[in-house]
């Protein structure tokens, strides 16, 4: 790296005898004396000024800059002055993930990160600032997986800023930084009797939704978006290819989560329930935008529709139909007249997926197969959520031996 230090208080000129002589400049005694200059990787000259008696510091700064450039860790001082919010907004706009995911990231950053660290220049970030950020979240009673998601978004922004040369290293990577703690709440699956009770308490037109959720493991958006041509009654399989999701209040058709289409076994009991349902409630042709609100209109013949032959809006369904069924089944209390139902996050329609997974695992199905049926990103995720539901090896051994010796004794 080519660099040099300019003394702005003195200049060198040739004297009468032709020898170089140092003379004071018109700036002598005013302002910062030394200006260290170098040419950055992009060919642009950069500089930093130092006061009188700090020429050695200017030399050290040039040496540090040269070392950073040789290691590929050079940070443009002007880029380092970009604030976290300025960079994060550009980063969000450049993400290629689905629109709903981007909206979620933007919402978390705007609500919780920008007010706390948005104005901080990227080049000034140190581990202490991230530790303070995490503590602020905890002090404001923002915790659990939601706080972990906020932290993950902040870390991703800072990681991209490192890649783009705005800071030398990600402060979130420091050993002293700990992400927000997440309590390891275990999934407690419903009993078969509870599944039946909730099903029986729903209006007749919605009961087969419980069969699909508990018997095929679909997510709520996948159940609501289940089309007639996805159900293969003759081959005993169900193709999960579409879901209905809301993008800023607009319903759209979209691929399943993670764009992972999948085939799942269709139990005969679920197939029967769907046949009976479609006899009473024939599939309804629905047109919605594809993936985003301004996407092309796409038509699907949906198996489940509301009383007006429109899509089942999950917000209305969850409050007015699902919670009423939960209360009737004794899973949540019945509210006083005029009062809303209690929060029932652990008893949402996702509970049907938990029931489905627990039944398969108890029957000895492999984690890999269950992961594929559920549409998880990888089996490790399935294992983290459901490992405690897997029968122990000793329990499996007892079952096998009881079957063998029980049969032998009976014969």
Q: What spans do the regions from the language model cover?
A:
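C-terminal secondary-structure termini that scaffold catalytic or DNA-interacting sites
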Residues: 1, 139, 200, 230, ...
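Basic/aromatic DNA-contact patch characteristic of tyrosine site-specific recombinases
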Residues: 1-86, 90-94, 103-107, 124, ...
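N-terminal core-binding DNA-recognition domain of tyrosine site-specific recombinases/integrases
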Residues: 28, 47-49, 54, 80-81, ...
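Catalytic-site neighborhood detector that most strongly recognizes the C-terminal catalytic loop/helix
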Residues: 53, 181, 189, 244, ...
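Short, basic (Lys/Arg/His-rich) helix/loop patches that form interaction surfaces
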Residues: 140, 197-207, 216, 264, ...
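Basic, Lys/Arg- and aromatic-enriched nucleic-acid-binding interface segment
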Residues: 144, 148-152, 163, 167-226, ...
């Amino acid at each position: 790296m080519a660099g040099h230090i300019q003394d702005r208080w003195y200049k060198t000129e040739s004297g009468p005898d032709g020898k170089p002589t140092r003379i004071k400049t018109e700036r002598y005694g005013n302002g910062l004396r030394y200006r260290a200059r170098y040419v950055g990787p992009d060919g642009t000259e950069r500089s930093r000024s130092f006061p009188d008696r700090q020429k050695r510091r200017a030399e050290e700064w040039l040496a540090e800059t040269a070392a950073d450039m040789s290691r590929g860790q050079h940070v443009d001082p002007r880029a380092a002055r970009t604030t976290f919010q300025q960079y994060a907004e550009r980063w969000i706009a450049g993400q290629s993930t689905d629109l709903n995911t981007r909206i979620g990231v933007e919402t978390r950053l705007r609500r919780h990160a920008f007010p706390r660290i948005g104005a901080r220049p990227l080049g000034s970030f140190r581990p202490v600032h991230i530790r303070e950020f995490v503590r602020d979240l905890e002090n404001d009673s923002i915790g659990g997986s939601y706080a972990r998601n906020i932290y993950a978004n902040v870390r991703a922004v800072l990681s991209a800023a490192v890649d783009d040369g705005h800071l030398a290293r990600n402060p979130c990577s420091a050993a002293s930084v700990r992400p927000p703690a997440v309590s390891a709440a275990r999934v407690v699956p419903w009993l078969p009797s509870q599944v039946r009770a909730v099903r029986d308490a729903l209006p007749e037109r919605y009961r087969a939704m419980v069969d699909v959720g508990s018997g095929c493991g679909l997510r709520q958006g996948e159940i609501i978006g289940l089309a007639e041509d996805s159900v293969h009654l003759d081959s005993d399989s169900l193709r999960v290819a579409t879901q209905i999701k809301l993008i800023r209040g607009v319903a759209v058709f979209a691929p399943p989560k993670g764009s992972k289409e999948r085939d799942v076994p269709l139990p005969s009991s679920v197939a029967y329930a769907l046949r009976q349902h479609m006899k009473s409630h024939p599939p309804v042709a629905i047109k919605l935008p594809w993936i985003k609100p301004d996407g092309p209109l796409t038509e699907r013949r949906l198996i489940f529709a509301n009383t007006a032959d429109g899509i089942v809006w999950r917000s209305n369904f969850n409050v007015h139909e699902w919670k009423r069924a939960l209360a009737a089944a004794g899973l949540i209390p019945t509210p006083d007249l005029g009062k809303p139902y209690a929060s029932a996050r652990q008893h949402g329609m996702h509970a049907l997926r938990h029931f489905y997974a627990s039944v398969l695992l108890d029957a000895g199905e492999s984690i890999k197969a269950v992961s594929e049926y559920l549409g998880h990103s990888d089996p490790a995720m399935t294992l983290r959520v459901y490992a405690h539901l897997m029968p122990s090896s000793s329990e499996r051994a007892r079952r096998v031996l009881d079957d063998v010796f029980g049969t032998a004794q009976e014969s």
